From Swiss-Prot:
Gene3D superfamilies: 1.20.1530.20, Regulator of K+ conductance, C-terminal domain. Residues 405-486 form the RCK C-terminal domain. This is K(+)/H(+) antiporter NhaP2. GO terms for molecular function: flavin adenine dinucleotide binding; potassium:proton antiporter activity. It is found in: Cell inner membrane. It comes from Vibrio cholerae serotype O1 (strain ATCC 39541 / Classical Ogawa 395 / O395). The gene is nhaP2. It catalyses: K(+)(in) + H(+)(out) = K(+)(out) + H(+)(in). It holds the Pfam family TrkA_C. Optimum pH is 7.75. Inactive below pH 6.5. It is a multi-pass membrane protein. GO terms for biological process: cell volume homeostasis. One of its GO terms (cellular component) is plasma membrane. The keyword Membrane applies. Belongs to the monovalent cation:proton antiporter 1 (CPA1) transporter (TC 2.A.36) family. NhaP2 subfamily.
Length: 581
């Protein structure tokens, strides 16, 4: 490779990345996932597009995709709160194992019928497209305010279900590639345990060692992110080399780093944010270049039937079976989890395995995986907002700081500087600072008005457009969000948590007198918390609700997994007037 070729490679790569970045706002305007934009740019640059770039190097695509996926999962793990495992761990594990197996089998049977494949070949297609994709799920759910039970389940499932898909894919390739492969129960159990066991062990052990190294060594701030990424990639590669799931390992490594006091954690996250975007762009550009659109047209109708069958048939059945033991999930939540079974880069990466193994029909497997991913991103990704609204799993958005910066006053400092911009519809406009009732231990470090630094006192009244700099810790974000809350843009969310709020310790007898409810003898001595326990169980999440005496009772506030306030949602005025008549 001469200097001219290398320079041309840099120019074309930079041009494609730049175009992808500049076209990213199109996704929000058209209501399509941003990953689809990156994929489309790659396809347009390919041999059937205007770029006429011929690219069919599957090993290079496999390398780029794995590198990108590792970075995306490291970032996703660091941003996942381990507290969410309380409500989502076992449901996620069930979906990541049993759910993937059921999806694989049902999709495989459909593929066998549509494409005249053998049973094992059809199930291989099902295994390739059987797992949800972490890159797609993290990207599309990022910044959305979802019911925590649902959101955490989807994210943890996408980060942990790849070992099952890899296990099934590799096993089936081994069987199809060699008639001598011993497909005994012991072999299957050992392979399954190796994928999950080695992946989990190396992820947690390696993550702890990496965390210790980061905190132990005093380095220039810019080097901590490099140490975190290089360490994560080493754990990823080592896990794969030992027969484990590198994807699971690096996700758990990120989870450990993000949930322990880690030196320069905020700096690491800031660097990872940019690297994750670059990884997503690079991965989907390469995958777009790899596919030949004209070949997809040959399988368009049966491929569409396979994708629709998986979305409307295989995935919902798998979710309902996987979540059957967990009574806390409502039917609406199960349907939403079924709908957000997003496919992305992982199925395409798995489809490269048969190509590299030289299996018959390998090109068909790859084209099918690509087609299913495209349909999933367009149909499921493009309708995500509508699905959230229909399933009623959307919560009123919590205002995020426009900026947050770690304050490294000591190596494992958890102090941050949160910056809020006040809008006209925030309740605190016109209030003096002394009336804000800031969370204990937090301080307003500075107030800016018209780009001028003020010298505020307790009597200083806040105005629209003021910028507040608040010293606090991550645990204070919830309280600060309530403090600087604003009216939701959607009318349907304006009274989401109810019209009136009651303390969880309130007696039902007092509530009944206040709202004219007729209680039975057993209910008279109970408290509101007993009612919540009876209807919602021990782990309700924000936004859960139940019907009682013709009214809706909504979990309006949760602190340390304990409900503290219940919202009472009254019927609309029309219904009240009809009842009065």
């Amino acid at each position: 490779m001469d200097a001219v070729t290398i320079n041309s490679f840099f120019m074309i790569g930079a041009l494609l990345i730049g175009i992808s970045v500049l076209l990213s706002p199109v996704s929000s305007k058209l209501g399509i996932p941003i990953l689809l934009v990156f994929l489309a740019v790659g396809m347009l640059a390919g041999e059937d597009g205007i770029g006429q770039i011929a690219f069919d190097n599957y090993p290079v695509a496999y390398l780029v995709s794995n590198l990108a996926l590792a970075i995306i999962l490291l970032d996703g793990g660091m941003r996942t709160r381990v507290a969410s495992f309380r409500v989502a761990f076992w449901p996620s594990v069930s979906l990541a194992t049993l759910g993937v197996a059921v999806t694989t089998l049902l999709t495989g049977l459909l593929a066998m019928w549509l494409f005249n494949l053998s049973l094992l070949q059809g199930v291989l297609v099902g295994a390739i497209v059987g797992s949800t994709d972490a890159a797609a799920v993290f990207s599309l759910l990022k910044g959305r305010s979802l019911n925590e039970r649902v959101g955490a389940t989807l994210e943890i499932e996408s980060g942990t279900n790849d070992p099952m898909a890899v296990f099934l894919t590799v096993t089936l390739i081994a069987v199809l590639g060699s008639a001598e492969t011993n497909l005994s129960a012991g072999f299957l159990l050992l392979s399954f345990a190796q994928q999950f066991g080695v992946g989990a062990l190396l992820g947690l052990a390696g993550g702890w060692i990496l965390w210790w190294l980061i905190n132990r060594n005093q380095l220039p701030e810019g080097l901590y992110s490099i140490l975190a990424v290089s360490g994560g990639l080493m754990i990823f590669a080592l896990s794969n080399a030992l027969g484990g799931s590198g994807i699971l390992s690096i996700y758990l490594t990120g989870l450990l780093l993000g949930n322990r006091p880690t030196r320069s954690r905020h700096a690491i996250l800031n660097v990872l944010d940019g690297m994750t975007w670059l990884a997503q762009i690079g991965m989907f550009l390469v995958l777009g270049l790899l596919v030949t659109p004209s070949e997809l047209m040959e399988i368009a109708l049966p491929g569409l039937a396979l994708a629709v069958g998986m979305i409307l048939f295989a995935r919902p059945i798998a979710v309902w079976i996987g979540l059957a033991p967990f009574k806390s999930f409502t039917a609406r939540e199960k349907w939403f989890v079924s709908w957000v079974g997003l496919r992305g880069a992982v199925p395409i990466i798995l489809a490269v395995f048969p190509m590299m193994a030289g299996l018959p029909n390998a090109q068909l497997y790859f084209n099918l995986a690509f087609f299913v991913v495209m349909v999933s991103l367009v149909v499921q990704g493009g309708t995500l907002t509508k699905a959230m609204s229909l399933a009623k799993v959307e919560l009123p958005p919590k205002p995020e700081p426009i900026s947050r910066t770690g304050v490294e006053i000591y190596p494992t400092s958890e102090w941050e500087l949160f910056i809020y911009k006040l809008k006209a519809d925030k309740w605190c406009i016109g209030e003096p600072l002394r009336n804000l009732f800031m969370p204990e231990g937090t301080r307003i470090a500075a107030v800016f008005r018209d780009n001028q630094l003020l010298h505020p006192s307790g009597s200083t009244e806040l105005c629209e457009g003021d910028t507040l700099c608040v010293m606090a810790q991550e645990r204070d974000l919830e309280s600060l969000s309530r403090l600087f809350s604003e009216a939701p843009e959607k009318a349907s969310l304006a009274r989401f948590f109810g019209d009136f709020f009651l303390d969880i310790e309130a007696k039902l007898q007092d509530v009944a007198l206040l709202y004219g409810l007729d209680l039975g003898e057993l209910e008279a001595d109970a408290k509101l918390k007993d009612l919540v326990l009876e209807h919602l169980g021990e782990t309700p999440v924000l936004g859960d609700y139940f019907e009682w005496h013709g009214l809706q009772w909504v979990v309006a506030d949760v602190v340390d997994w304990k409900v503290t306030k219940i919202g009472l949602r009254l019927p609309p005025e029309e219904e009240l007037q009809e009842g009065a008549e």
